[in-house]
């Protein structure tokens, strides 16, 4: 397998199907950001796996994150595919799977009414970093839509839920590790319908 092609030396790449585009094309920006999100998640997975205490407490979440990496690659593949060239890989089942995970975890969390400032533990903060990186990916995907480029709308739903998942898992991580959340002191009550 040849890693370098020299094709990108002039600032261009190819989408699925062969269309030549600039490396600053909205699709390339979106799937490049997806790759960043997936890579950052790999750091979290490795850190949990390598720390016996973390793996004991967060092993299930680590396994979920490994599955999420697979789903992120499906999302990236769909983003690299101009609309209609092939069937999309990401499905509504991926969205439902994330919702089921959150529905399982949210009842375990203490009542939350205000904004949370990332902290409490390094791992919780890493999940909040995942949340914000995922929101960045979501904005890049919206830019693809605004550029009149067709995308898998299920992928956008998935990324929206994924950010929520990382928020929930960040809070759950602090709970499981015995750390308190840092509440934004000037926050109005915003989660009125939460547990």
Roles of regions detected by a PLM:
Residues 1-195:
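Phosphate/pyrophosphate-binding loop motifs in nucleotide- or prenyl diphosphate-using proteins
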């Amino acid at each position: 397998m040849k890693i370098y092609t020299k094709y990108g030396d002039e600032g261009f790449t190819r989408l699925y199907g062969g269309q030549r585009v600039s490396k600053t094309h909205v699709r390339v920006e979106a799937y490049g950001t997806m790759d960043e999100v997936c890579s950052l998640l790999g750091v979290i997975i490795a850190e949990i796996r390598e720390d016996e205490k973390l793996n004991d407490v967060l092993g299930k979440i680590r396994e979920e994150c490994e599955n999420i990496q697979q789903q992120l690659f499906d999302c990236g593949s769909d983003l690299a595919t101009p609309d209609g060239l092939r069937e999309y890989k990401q499905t509504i089942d991926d969205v439902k799977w994330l919702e089921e995970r959150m529905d399982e975890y949210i009842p375990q969390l203490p009542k939350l009414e205000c904004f949370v400032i990332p902290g409490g533990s390094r791992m919780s903060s890493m999940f909040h970093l995942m949340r914000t990186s995922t929101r960045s990916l979501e904005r890049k995907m919206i830019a693809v839509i605004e550029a009149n480029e067709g995308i898998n709308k299920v992928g956008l739903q998935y990324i929206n839920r994924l950010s929520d998942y990382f928020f929930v898992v960040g809070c759950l991580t602090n709970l499981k590790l015995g750390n308190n959340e840092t509440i934004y002191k000037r926050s109005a009550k915003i989660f009125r319908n939460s547990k």
